[in-house]
């Protein structure tokens, strides 16, 4: 059994990236970048375990893609790594950033082969440009540009990261502890993705698949007294409202389920559970806006939505255009890509008895095409 665990750091907010989509959720073929990098590593070496850090809200989504250990990331890279190290049981750990996807097998193998030589094995490259420090030109042959992955003694790394200082990588933390670091030559292809312009350097990545992803949503709410009726985010004049934990906007709820279904991200109850008082009586427009923000951050583009409201009463026709305008504002997609229909059940069933309203939705998504940047 291997004595080495792989830790991949992917909990960042991509604040410097300059796009709505997070770096770890750029799609390569039909895989998000974090999964592509994970599979690239696991194809190279039989790790004892793989631990991936993720933003807390995204952990349920990561778990739908793989069976690796997913842990909660933190505000800093260092704290995220400490969280991951709590799950590491092996004497050695290989740490890398998901934002450095073009990992070269020969570099990884060289790192692993040299693991007994120091507390940390570090790949580096030398700068090709002139280097100036404080207005003084220095010998660039004495300068090392540090890369990941880096292999460390697990116990020493844990100790190094708890010195009360913030470090930008494992090697600097271990050096500050007075432990030995061993450098090996890395590879210039192992670029780190920080800014959107860096995408042009990552020629190892396959462009996103042209796959269309389609999801369906269905929701039902019963009528109740003493509540206002909301559909598609607008108030509908009626003598009853709908019962529910939130404002019970049945149309928006069906649409959220369709969007999440297309992304493969579960359903509205997983994302906004009714056991959470945060969502008590909440305006469903806020839930839809958060869903749209999340889908964009995870690399999806909303291509089209189709929504059917099933109600005996009130009559929906007079409000359809206003509803479409509301959805246009919430989804932030062109007006003509939103289709809204209304029907009755001809007095059949609970809808026909005027006991409640149902809604059905279909959503089509595609992947954000970063190759066109």
Curated annotation (Swiss-Prot):
Entry-linked HAMAP family: IspDF, IspF
GO biological process, one term: isopentenyl diphosphate biosynthetic process, methylerythritol 4-phosphate pathway
Region of interest: 2-C-methyl-D-erythritol 2,4-cyclodiphosphate synthase: 213-373
Pathway membership: Isoprenoid biosynthesis; isopentenyl diphosphate biosynthesis via DXP pathway; isopentenyl diphosphate from 1-deoxy-D-xylulose 5-phosphate: step 2/6; Isoprenoid biosynthesis; isopentenyl diphosphate biosynthesis via DXP pathway; isopentenyl diphosphate from 1-deoxy-D-xylulose 5-phosphate: step 4/6
InterPro entries xref list: IspD (IPR001228), IspD/F (IPR026596), IspD/TarI (IPR034683), MECDP_synthase (IPR003526), MECDP_synthase_CS (IPR020555), MECDP_synthase_sf (IPR036571), Nucleotide-diphossugar_trans (IPR029044)
Residue numbers marked as site, Transition state stabilizer: 16, 23, 245, 344
Gene Ontology molecular function: 2-C-methyl-D-erythritol 2,4-cyclodiphosphate synthase activity; 2-C-methyl-D-erythritol 4-phosphate cytidylyltransferase activity; metal ion binding
Region (2-C-methyl-D-erythritol 4-phosphate cytidylyltransferase): 1-213
Pfam family, one: YgbB
Keywords: Isoprene biosynthesis, Lyase, Metal-binding, Multifunctional enzyme, Nucleotidyltransferase, Transferase
Cysteines engaged in disulfide bonds, as pairs: none
Species per Swiss-Prot/TrEMBL record: Nitratiruptor sp. (strain SB155-2)
Cofactor(s) listed in the protein's UniProt record: a divalent metal cation
Enzyme Commission identifier(s): 2.7.7.60, 4.6.1.12
Function: Bifunctional enzyme that catalyzes the formation of 4-diphosphocytidyl-2-C-methyl-D-erythritol from CTP and 2-C-methyl-D-erythritol 4-phosphate (MEP) (IspD), and catalyzes the conversion of 4-diphosphocytidyl-2-C-methyl-D-erythritol 2-phosphate (CDP-ME2P) to 2-C-methyl-D-erythritol 2,4-cyclodiphosphate (ME-CPP) with a corresponding release of cytidine 5-monophosphate (CMP) (IspF).
NCBIfam families: ispD, ispF, PRK09382.1
Catalytic activity of the protein: 2-C-methyl-D-erythritol 4-phosphate + CTP + H(+) = 4-CDP-2-C-methyl-D-erythritol + diphosphate; 4-CDP-2-C-methyl-D-erythritol 2-phosphate = 2-C-methyl-D-erythritol 2,4-cyclic diphosphate + CMP
Protein name: Bifunctional enzyme IspD/IspF
